[in-house]
Design a protein with these regions (language model features):
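Residues within helix-turn-helix
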Residues: 36, 135, 146-149
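Sigma70-family region 2
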Residues: 6, 44-61, 81-82
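DNA-recognition helix of helix-turn-helix
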Residues: 71, 75, 141-165
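N-terminal module of bacterial RNA polymerase sigma factors
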Residues: 1-26, 30, 97-98, 110-114, ...
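A short pre-motif secondary-structure segment
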Residues: 123-127
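Internal acidic/polar
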Residues: 76, 83-114, 133-135, 168
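Arg/Lys-rich amphipathic alpha helix in sigma70-family domain 2
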Residues: 55-57, 68-88, 154
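Structural recognition of an alpha-helix C-terminal capping motif at a helix-to-coil junction
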Residues: 26, 40-47, 60-72
């Protein structure tokens, strides 16, 4: 994508927004646990993509590149001073309408995923919600594939425990 004109860059951005806007908003919300912060993150992600289009060399897939920008942006926002001012408890009712279905099981899953530790949540989000492969997640997060596999297993186990506990409560 090097040496692209402003027109080509804007056209390419429109394509990327169309392809990734909804899944990225969903991921950002589950990552940041705040709708306003997720929307801000989404804008920041697409701004970074626009500014850095000419740096994409095809060494990884486009999706991996976009997700790496998204994860890094969410990580930065999550660790900024602003994140301390927001309520970090997520309920499915707080989710942006286009990001979650209203099925009770879906609501329980969203709440459970949001309740995971960040390092487990991010691999679950990238694997199940963004459909990245283990090697793509490893590249996106800058960790080994075995670390990704371990976090996926721990995340699944934790989700299973959380969801089974909720079934018993009802």
């Amino acid at each position: 994508m090097s040496d692209i004109t402003d027109f080509d860059r804007e056209k390419r951005l429109e394509e990327l927004v169309g392809r990734y806007q909804t899944p990225l908003l969903h991921m950002c919300y589950l990552y940041l646990c705040d709708q306003s912060m997720a929307e801000d993150a989404l804008q920041e992600i697409f701004l970074k993509i626009y500014r850095n289009m000419d740096r994409f060399r095809g060494e990884c897939s486009e999706k991996t590149w976009v997700m790496k920008i998204a994860v890094n942006t969410c990580y930065s926002m999550n660790h900024s001073g602003w994140s301390r001012f927001f309520n970090r408890h997520v309920t499915p009712e707080m989710m942006p309408d286009e990001t979650v279905q209203t099925d009770d099981e879906d609501k329980q899953l969203v709440s459970a995923v949001a309740g995971l530790l960040l390092k487990l949540r991010e691999v679950i989000l990238l694997y199940y919600f963004q459909n990245l492969k283990v090697n793509e997640i490893a590249e996106t997060l800058g960790i080994s594939q075995s670390s990704v596999s371990g976090r996926l297993k721990r995340g699944r186990d934790r989700l299973k425990t959380m969801l089974e506990g909720r079934e018993l409560d009802e």
